[in-house]
Amino acid sequence: GDIVQDVNIPIELDANDGFEDRTGYIVIKNQGDVVEVSDTLYVTQRLYSQIVYVKAGANGDGSSWERAFGTIEEGLSACAHYGDMQMWVAAGDYYLKDWIEFKKVNFYGGFEGKETTVSERTMKRKSILHAASSNVWPSVYMYKLTEGATRVVDGFEFVDSKGKKGEGALVAYEYWMIRNCVVRNNTCARDAGGAYFLCTLINCVIRDNETLSTSSTINVQQSTCLYNVTVVNNRSAGSSAGVR
C-alpha cells in the first residue's frame, strides 16, 4: 500500500505590511534528478494589522472585531513596545490573571465592538479591568516612556485591587496620558489605595478607594498634571484620603 510519512517543513515569512492579504504556495517534490511533484501547499497571509482587537468572550487572533482576542493578556502579547499599534478593547468586564504591563502603545476602551475609528465610540460603558484576587501588587504598570513618546490610555475602569504591596490599582510613570478613566473600589495595605501617578490625567474619576496605612489614597508626584479630575469618597487610615 501507500507509504505515509510525516514531513516537517520550516517556513519563514516576512510580515505582511501591505494593504491586502497575500497568497503563496509551496511545492513538495522528491530529491534526485527526476522531478516528481507530490503535493502543493497554499499559504494565505493575512494583512498585518496596526490595531489589536479585544472583546470579552471572543476566541480569535485579534485582527478584527469579528476575530478579536478574548482577554487583555492575549491582546498585550500581540503588541510591541513603541510600535505604531493600538489596542482597541470592547466595553465589558475583563478579569486579569495577574498584574500586567501596558506595552508602550495606545490603548482605547469603551467600544461597542463594531467601530472603525476611535471617534465613533459612544463611551456609554467602559472596559473594566478587574484585578486578580491573588495579586498583591498593583494590577497595571505603565512604565516610563522615552521623552516625547506620549501614549494614551482612554476609556477604562481599574477596579477591585486588594494590594498589600505597592500602590493601589495602577502605577503610571512619565509621559503617559490617562483620559476618560475611572479608578474605583481598590484598597492597599501599605501605600496609596487608588494609584500612583507621574503622568497626565484628563477627565478622570477616582472614587471609593481605601488606604489601610497612613498614606494618601492617591500618590501624585512632581510632574503630574490633572485636568478635570474628580477625587471623591476615598478613605485613608492617615490624615489624607485624597491627594498627596
Regions found by a protein language model. Name each.
Residues 72-81, 94-102, 141-144:
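Short, T/G/N/S-enriched strand-turn elements that build extracellular solenoid repeat scaffolds
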Residues 105-165:
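Right-handed parallel beta-helix/beta-spiral solenoid domain characteristic of secreted/periplasmic
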Residues 9-11, 20-32:
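A short beta-strand micro-motif common to beta-rich folds, especially ectodomain repeats
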Residues 56-89:
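Acidic Gly/Asp/Thr-rich repetitive segments characteristic of extracellular carbohydrate-active
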Residues 1-12:
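Surface-exposed binding patches on compact interaction domains or structured appendages
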Residues 126-144, 162-171, 187-194, 210-221, ...:
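Extracellular beta-strand/beta-solenoid scaffold signature
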Residues 83-106, 110-117:
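N-terminal extracellular ligand-recognition/capping segment immediately after the signal peptide
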